[in-house]
Amino acid sequence: MPETESAFFPGGTAVSRLQVYDWAADDGLCGGSPHVHLACTEAYVVVGGSGALQTLTAQGLAEIPLRTGTVAWFGPGTIHRAINGDGALRVVVVMQNAGLPEAGDAVLTFPSDVLADPGAYAAAASLLDPGGSHASDENAAHRRRDLAISGFHRLAERIGAGDVSALTEFYRQALALRADRLDAWERLWRDGPSAAVARTGDHLAALRDGRVDHLLRAAAEVRHAPEPADRKFGMCGRLDTYELTPPSVKPAL
């Protein structure tokens, strides 16, 4: 009998279930911490409730309405903030490049002086895991959310006044915080998402040659939702995360 072959999760992506925070900020809006991904596209599939996604790019501040059934996605460099409009916003998050977000691909929009100091950033981020992005507890998640919103508003004001250099400065500070991880990120991408794409090329070549051996190695995999006590304090809200990365593709930061 042929040995089975572990299947990559579709597209080398990762999924999680998100309950957006319902804590009110100083501006009266409830929701999560504004942040940016440096290398990954993110998608929201709204499965309950309603709200909005605020985005900040070189084009300025924008707001995307979210309601059940909405699918929204945004590329690297899009600063984003999830707003819980009715207190019940729930989303399935699809992340490009499984492994990279878990390895710290996201950077919060803290004020510039905090971003300029790696130690200050790490302390303000209150990380559960130094290599990741989840907060250590609810109070820490609340504090860092408020600090990130203060930096977000400053960026939005400058960009709204036509000073796009504010965005460049933020990106450069974010890159400086993560520059020492780039080699590890590239390994994760090469061994995971890139390998998943390459495997499709191998399968197409086999089919073109009339070979079906790879189909005989097919297997199914499943992951179940974590226990409620194991839900993470993410940047946007409480997260149910799933370990979808093959064992051979793990961050070594």
Regions found by a protein language model. Give the residues of each.
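Double-stranded beta-helix
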Residues: 86-163
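Short, conserved beta-strand element in jelly-roll/cupin
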Residues: 38-53, 96
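Phosphorylation-prone, low-complexity intrinsically disordered regions
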Residues: 187-225
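Conserved short histidine dyad/triad with adjacent acidic residue
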Residues: 2-4, 17-38
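Acidic/histidine-enriched, beta-strand-rich ligand/metal-binding domains
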Residues: 79, 83-87, 92, 97-107, ...
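Extended alpha-helical scaffolds
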Residues: 131-202
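Charge-dense, extended regions
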Residues: 216-253
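Short acidic-glycine-tyrosine-enriched beta hairpin
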Residues: 56-77
